[in-house]
Amino acid sequence: MTAHASIATPGGISLATGRDVRLASRSGALTGSTAGFAPGFVQANLAILPAKLAFDFLRFCQRNPKPCPVIGVSEPGDPTLSSIGLDLDIRTDVPGYCVYKDGVLVDEPADLKAYWREDLVTFAIGCSLSFEEALMAADIPLRHVEKGVKVPMFRTNIACVPAGPFAGPMVVSMRPMTPANAIRAVQITSRFPSVHGAPIHIGLPEAIGIKDLSKPDYGDAVEILEGEIPVFWACGVTPQSVISAAKIEYALAHGPGMMLCTDLKNSALATG
């Protein structure tokens, strides 16, 4: 989750809004991470499944709202999600995608035109980029942003509530903070329940099954300085991990760090 120096492609195409990023992805002008682009706009994780599994997955998300906050669901076979974006096409409007067959990653295409099916249902799931913007606006430093690396993520011993074939441990992201900033972060992120909300754990990583903070399961390791404590949030990698573990016959998702940029504003997600 790196912050980009400018909100434009090398070719000068603006990436200031969610629609700008979608159109740049559609044209092939944007092929990498969306972090730092479309500031102020909500970015979403994608989980795309056959309709026969959609109800079970929706129940899984409803039972596990911290790691799986749903912000949009499509009709079967419909690649649009007008509730979160004008002229949005799920098949083309993300810089890169993942294709899973029987739980195994088999391709990482630039678009889903060759992989789209009429029985597919898209779930857009809230992303921590939204609350990170609020933390940075409050002058709370984020080490992974400062270092230009991906946030470290870990599988825990916290079991998600199962639904149908979907079950498994919660994945969390970790951000080191001073105790004072951790308290402020709880206050700030509590106002964003649709993008993971408040931390689920602070300190003592071993209490949630994490043995070594220098060896994340996903993302990149970051240093924890003297006087800092690890702060853990439920993470949107959880649904992808659970889908893969379920070994369902066919599923699609966004590529790592390549989110769906919506027309929703981060400020509109805040409560209270």
From Swiss-Prot:
Its Enzyme Commission number? 4.2.1.-
Pfam families, A to Z: D-Glu_cyclase
InterPro entries per record:
D-Glu_cyclase, Putative_hydro-lyase, UPF0317
State the Gene Ontology terms under molecular function: lyase activity
Q: Which UniProt keywords apply?
A: Lyase
Q: Which SUPFAM superfamilies match?
A: PSTPO5379-like (SSF160920)
Family to which the UniProt record says this protein belongs: Belongs to the D-glutamate cyclase family.
Database matches in PANTHER family: D-GLUTAMATE CYCLASE, MITOCHONDRIAL
* Identification of the protein by name: Putative hydro-lyase AZC_4080
Species: Azorhizobium caulinodans (strain ATCC 43989 / DSM 5975 / JCM 20966 / LMG 6465 / NBRC 14845 / NCIMB 13405 / ORS 571)
Organism lineage reads as: Bacteria, Pseudomonadati, Pseudomonadota, Alphaproteobacteria, Hyphomicrobiales
